[in-house]
């Protein structure tokens, strides 16, 4: 449940008017971005597959995390259904996601519900985040919160951030940073609570934060304090999870899936496109050599100089090992007006090699989309096409 960060400088929700502009503490980047970046850095480091953000608010953190290639399931939970419906579309795939599919599947779901309710669809997660959430809970919900999140959901890692009240005196006329906050803890209060919860539910915890204090006020600590909880022994086993009864109390208000190379139609689309591009690149690079050979035989090839010459395309930069692998692979060749590129040659290129494990796999995927030689060992293309003639190439 994220705080408002007005004018990208205030950390005081709803109280910016009370803080004189000349005394407002400036955070660069803004504090809310520092919190999100902190979570993203953890995701980059630990590569969780299943991530849930409790109290996801306007889904800003989810939008930041959805581009991470390791995540396969991303879930947001919030009590404000209207906000979830309004922001859901911002999590849907864009055109670029279809043009360049992810390696792994990604499903994003937004649930309307309370974080102190048990829903079995959030079992077995690698990471659950609670960014600026707990201070919005009343005493009853705060008591139930550990039972649900740590005891029932029991993810591998939990990140909880909350305001550090020791920082508040640096903001003029501020007691609580948001009118909806039920409390704000000192570092000692937060750490006492966190250590008790960690010990009870078999987690370890370490403390850090974001939002450096100004010079001369280092003793107050970070503006936002953060606890990182790690499950001792890792994630709950599949057998333990299977013993949990299904409880679907949350209401799904938005869900979307991203195209990926794990989906047959998108894998084929990408592979056919990559093969076609590589064959075309090899064909075009082969034409000047053909003209040189024609000149040696006494033929008179057309002039390729001047403005009609096509602009050369710059391909990827290969390592010495990759270059050697390509050079040692079967060479493209011509038979009459046809240009042949062996599949083994294509598989020598790193990008295609990453997509396809072997020649048989490549052949089976592209056979009905790209012309192949009679024995299926090479892609066949016309040596010259309409555009070559137009450019007198």
Curated annotation (Swiss-Prot):
Note on cofactor: Binds 1 Mg(2+) ion per subunit.
Location of this chain's protein in the cell: Cytoplasm
Names of the cofactor(s): Mg(2+)
Disordered: region residues: 286-307
Binding site for Mg(2+): 132, 135-136, 181
GO biological process: piRNA processing; RNA methylation; siRNA processing
A Gene Ontology term for the protein's cellular component: P granule
Basic and acidic residues bias (residue ranges): 290-305
SUPFAM superfamilies: S-adenosyl-L-methionine-dependent methyltransferases (SSF53335)
Keywords on record: Cytoplasm, Magnesium, Metal-binding, Methyltransferase, RNA-binding, RNA-mediated gene silencing, S-adenosyl-L-methionine, Transferase
Reaction equations catalysed: small RNA 3'-end nucleotide + S-adenosyl-L-methionine = small RNA 3'-end 2'-O-methylnucleotide + S-adenosyl-L-homocysteine + H(+)
One Pfam family cited in the UniProt record for this chain: Methyltransf_23
Molecular functions per Gene Ontology: metal ion binding; O-methyltransferase activity; RNA binding; RNA methyltransferase activity; small RNA 2'-O-methyltransferase activity
Free-text function comment from the UniProt entry: Methyltransferase that adds a 2'-O-methyl group at the 3'-end of piRNAs, a class of 24 to 30 nucleotide RNAs that are generated by a Dicer-independent mechanism and are primarily derived from transposons and other repeated sequence elements. This probably protects the 3'-end of piRNAs from uridylation activity and subsequent degradation. Stabilization of piRNAs is essential for gametogenesis.
UniProt family annotation: Belongs to the methyltransferase superfamily. HEN1 family.
Name of this chain's protein: Small RNA 2'-O-methyltransferase
Source organism: Homo sapiens (Human)
Gene name tied to this protein: HENMT1
């Amino acid at each position: 449940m994220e705080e408002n960060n007005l004018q990208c400088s205030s950390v005081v929700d709803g109280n910016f008017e009370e803080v004189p502009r000349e005394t407002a503490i400036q955070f660069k980047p803004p504090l809310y971005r520092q919190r999100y970046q902190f979570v993203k850095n953890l995701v980059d480091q630990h590569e969780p597959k299943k991530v849930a953000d409790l109290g996801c608010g306007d889904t800003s953190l989810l939008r930041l995390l959805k581009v991470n290639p390791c995540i396969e399931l991303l879930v947001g939970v919030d009590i404000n259904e209207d906000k979830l419906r309004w922001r859901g579309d911002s999590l849907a795939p864009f055109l670029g996601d279809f043009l360049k599919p992810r390696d792994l599947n990604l499903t994003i779901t937004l649930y309307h519900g309370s974080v102190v309710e048990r829903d079995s669809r959030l079992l077995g997660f690698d990471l659950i985040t609670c960014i600026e959430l707990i201070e919005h809970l009343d005493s009853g919900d705060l008591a139930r919160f550990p039972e649900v999140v740590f005891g029932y959901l029991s993810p591998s890692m939990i990140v909880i951030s909350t305001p550090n009240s020791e920082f508040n005196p640096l903001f003029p006329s501020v007691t609580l940073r948001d009118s909806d906050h039920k409390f704000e803890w000192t570092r000692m209060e937060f750490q006492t609570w966190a250590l008790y919860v960690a010990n009870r539910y078999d987690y370890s915890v370490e403390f850090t934060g974001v939002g450096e204090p100004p010079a001369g006020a280092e003793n107050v600590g970070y503006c936002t304090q953060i606890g990182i909880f790690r499950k001792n022994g890792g994630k709950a086993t599949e057998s333990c999870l299977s013993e949990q009864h299904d409880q679907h109390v949350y209401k799904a208000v938005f869900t979307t899936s991203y195209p990926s190379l794990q989906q047959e139609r998108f894998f084929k689309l990408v592979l056919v496109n990559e093969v076609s591009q590589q064959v075309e690149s090899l064909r075009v690079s082969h034409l000047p050599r053909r003209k040189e050979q024609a000149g040696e035989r006494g033929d008179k090839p057309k002039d390729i100089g001047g403005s009609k010459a096509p602009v050369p395309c710059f391909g990827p930069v290969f390592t010495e090992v990759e270059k050697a692998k390509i050079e040692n692979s079967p060479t493209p060749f011509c038979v009459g007006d046809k240009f042949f590129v062996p599949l083994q040659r294509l598989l020598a290129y790193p990008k295609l090699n990453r997509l396809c494990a072997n020649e048989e796999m490549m052949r089976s995927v592209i056979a009905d989309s790209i012309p192949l030689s009679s024995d299926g060992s090479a892609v066949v293309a016309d040596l010259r096409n309409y555009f070559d003639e137009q450019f007198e190439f």
